[in-house]
A protein has these predicted regions:
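Acyl-donor (CoA/ACP) binding surface of acyl/acetyltransferases
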Residues: 1-40, 67, 71-183
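Conserved GNAT-fold acetyl-CoA-binding loop/helix
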Residues: 38-59
Length: 183
């Protein structure tokens, strides 16, 4: 079962990061990382071809109020995002009547393998479980995206099931659905 999300007035902080709602002024930073070949593709979407495309998606992030911008404290640069999406997968009866959401995330290629996404997702998990009182979170990663799966494993997500995902750029990817319960 999904719960309503509105992060428009939420600001989360970690040692290196600020997680906050997107702003129109983030457009240049967003386009900078979203236009790099291979970044969006690891999350199921094609890299952006124009600033106008990034602007449309940025407006959607702002309107939907469920996607955090990941901001580096040291320079206030937006380097990625984490969405708290509605669960889109068929889950078993044990989860049917519980409150849950699906996490999706992407990070600028310049910041891969620095522990940043683990730090950011950890803070969002804390928010989802302590503030939103969710019972569980799920996340999906393509089987070839070992780094993304490793982030989830470090944060105690457990294998739930193998699935197939059709991406927005019309490929079919073998994927793993991971589950984290709020105990």
């Amino acid at each position: 079962m999904n719960v309503e999300i509105d992060i428009s007035n939420v600001k989360l902080e970690t040692e290196r990061l600020i997680l906050r709602a997107w702003e129109i002024t983030d457009l240049d930073n967003f386009f900078e990382y979203a236009s790099v070949n291979g970044v969006g593709e690891k999350a199921g979407w094609e890299h952006h071809k124009s600033k106008d495309e990034s602007l449309e998606i940025l407006k959607m992030f702002i309107d939907e109020k469920k996607v955090f911008a990941i901001v580096l404290k040291e320079n206030q640069k937006v380097i990625g995002s984490i969405g708290i999406e509605e669960c889109r997968q068929d889950l078993d009866k044990n989860l049917e009547n519980l409150l849950g959401r699906e996490l999706g995330y992407v990070l600028s290629k310049d910041y891969w393998n620095k522990g940043i996404m683990t730090e950011a997702v950890s803070k969002v998990i804390e928010y989802c479980f302590k503030i939103l009182k969710l019972n569980y979170l799920i996340a999906t990663c393509f089987n070839y995206n070992v780094a993304s799966k490793r982030v989830l494993e470090k944060l105690n997500f457990k294998f739930y099931k193998d699935i197939i995902i059709k991406t927005r750029y019309n490929t079919v990817e073998k994927s793993t659905l991971m589950l984290l319960k709020n105990n």
